[in-house]
């Protein structure tokens, strides 16, 4: 006779693995698109010969600032909106699908200055979509864990993200970038018109789509224990609720508010280093 407890434990383990796989796919895509490959491609190849006194790296910084501002405005209210568990799968599916579609569209960006603006728009939109998708993703942790297991499961997802980024970087480097001359990588793709980089973007998009799909398929089956305590809130209602909660916290413990602001600035600083490290190093 099957043991119901064992079956439930196996199902939970599968859901945790599916949850971690999404992080593996998302972090890998971010490493390729925003840090090491596409951003460098825009500044070192697409933007070469750009008329005017502003360098491609400066335009990249402005695009990143727009993406960061968008995330800063939308992420808190998205967090309020997805407090209802049934909304998390919808938000995660839409934002993940958007990031995949935008990354696929990067295949159209040739190494010509006329394509720089479109490339910057795609880069900023992908960065914003990918970052916002982490909001419903992180909210799902409460549906997968207890207070005693939250740290272990969260760490497993975090580690999976690093493994995914390193693994995809190796795949892209060995298959599409290594070597010199007019053809690169083990696939011997031509560098003319940036074809090797453009093909790499399709691989990065497929990486997120394949690794993110298991979570999207099981997300609607996650426990909805918090649904009753978090009634549905509209977008504008989310801003009102957010302001109410911040005001209440400010009156209760201002040090916590200071900490949240400082941690946000710290994370943004790290994100800027990650985004521009490869660009400045080329």
Cite the ranges covered by each PLM segment:
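Glycine-rich segments within core transmembrane alpha-helices of 12-TM secondary carriers
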Residues: 154-180
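Juxtamembrane intracellular "pre-TM" segments in multi-pass secondary transporters
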Residues: 2-17, 220-261
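Central cavity-lining transmembrane alpha-helices of secondary-active solute carriers
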Residues: 37, 57-82, 101-102, 166-169
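A single, central transmembrane helix in multi-pass transporters
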Residues: 247-282
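Cytoplasmic membrane-interface "Motif A"-like loop-to-helix N-cap segments
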Residues: 82-98
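Cytoplasmic helix-loop-helix junction between adjacent transmembrane helices
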Residues: 122, 126-160
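Short amphipathic helix-loop junctions that connect adjacent transmembrane helices
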Residues: 31-58, 275-282
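C-terminal ends and interior cores of transmembrane alpha-helices
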Residues: 93-114
């Amino acid at each position: 006779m099957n043991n119901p407890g064992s079956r439930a434990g196996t199902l939970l383990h599968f859901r945790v693995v599916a949850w971690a796989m999404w992080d593996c796919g998302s972090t890998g895509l971010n490493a390729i698109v925003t840090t090491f490959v596409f951003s460098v491609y825009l500044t070192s190849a697409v933007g070469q010969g750009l008329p005017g006194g502003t360098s491609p790296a400066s335009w990249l910084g402005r695009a990143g600032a727009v993406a960061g501002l968008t995330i800063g405005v939308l992420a808190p209210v998205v967090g309020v909106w997805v407090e209802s568990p049934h909304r998390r799968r919808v938000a995660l599916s839409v934002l993940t699908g958007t990031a995949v579609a935008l990354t696929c569209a990067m295949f159209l960006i040739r190494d010509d200055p006329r394509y720089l603006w479109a490339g910057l728009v795609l880069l900023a939109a992908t960065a914003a979509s990918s970052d916002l998708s982490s909001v419903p993703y992180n909210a799902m942790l409460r549906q997968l864990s207890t207070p005693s297991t939250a740290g272990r499961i969260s760490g497993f997802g975090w580690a999976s993200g690093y493994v995914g980024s390193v693994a995809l970087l190796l795949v892209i480097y060995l298959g599409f970038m290594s070597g010199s001359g007019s053809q690169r990588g083990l696939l011997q793709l031509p560098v003319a018109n940036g074809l090797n980089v453009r093909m790499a973007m399709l691989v990065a998009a497929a990486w997120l789509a394949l690794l993110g799909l298991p979570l999207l398929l099981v997300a609607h089956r996650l426990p909805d224990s918090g649904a009753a305590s978090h009634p549905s809130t509209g977008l504008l209602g989310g801003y009102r609720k957010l302001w109410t909660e911040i005001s209440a916290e400010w009156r209760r413990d201002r040090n916590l508010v200071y900490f949240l602001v400082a941690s946000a600035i710290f994370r943004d600083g790290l994100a800027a280093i990650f985004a521009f490290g490869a660009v400045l190093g080329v």
